[in-house]
Regions:
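Aromatic- and Lys/Arg-enriched surface recognition patch
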Residues: 98-124
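Structural motif
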Residues: 41, 94-96
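Short, charged beta-turn/beta-strand-edge "cap" motif at the junction between a beta-strand
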Residues: 76-78, 83-85, 103-104
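Generic structural signal for buried aliphatic residues
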Residues: 71, 77-78, 97-98
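Short, positively charged and aromatic/hydrophobic N-terminal segments
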Residues: 3-16
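Short coil-to-beta-strand transition motifs
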Residues: 25-29, 87-94
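Acidic, low-complexity mobile loops and tails
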Residues: 15-73, 114-148
Length: 148
């Protein structure tokens, strides 16, 4: 399997993209991850576009021992494996890992990333160090423009 730095490396610009689900209440990274803020805590996952580009998800690899660690923005916190490739998961903002969605480590449940990327397939829950850091992320319109 090829390991890639981010999901954007999978894009074939010669293909016409289908309409992707891009909820307006989320913020997005250039690495095709989303973050949903709830107070000072936030849920993080990969976008509908990312799961579509990756194909069938087989495993979400986030060590549960990471809970309690504080990571910087763009620091790797895990990986996601698909039939096509493996991709790194990067922190969208700095924060403390509060919870890992361990259900996704099961191959059957990992498929939730394909069917429900913004719901049951959240990957980690974090305590955001600085909520203002989200201002540097993409809103839904900017993310939609990015993926074309």
């Amino acid at each position: 399997m090829t390991k890639i730095r981010n999901f954007a490396a999978l894009i074939d610009t010669t293909l016409i993209q289908t309409k992707m689900n891009i909820p307006a209440n989320l913020k997005y990274t250039n690495d095709d991850e989303w973050i949903r803020l709830e107070g000072e805590e936030a849920y993080v996952g990969i976008t509908d576009y990312a799961q579509h580009e990756l194909g069938d998800i087989t495993f979400v690899d986030v060590d549960p021992d990471i809970v309690g660690e504080t990571l910087d923005a763009q620091e790797e916190f895990g990986a996601i494996e698909a039939v096509k490739t493996t991709a790194e998961l990067l922190m969208p903002v700095a924060g403390e890992i509060l919870e890992v969605n361990e259900a996704l480590a099961d191959e059957e449940n990992a498929k939730l990333v394909n069917s429900d990327p913004y719901g049951e397939a959240w990957i980690i829950k974090i305590k955001v160090n600085d909520v203002a850091e989200l201002d540097g992320l993409l809103d839904a319109a900017a993310y939609e423009a990015k993926i074309g």
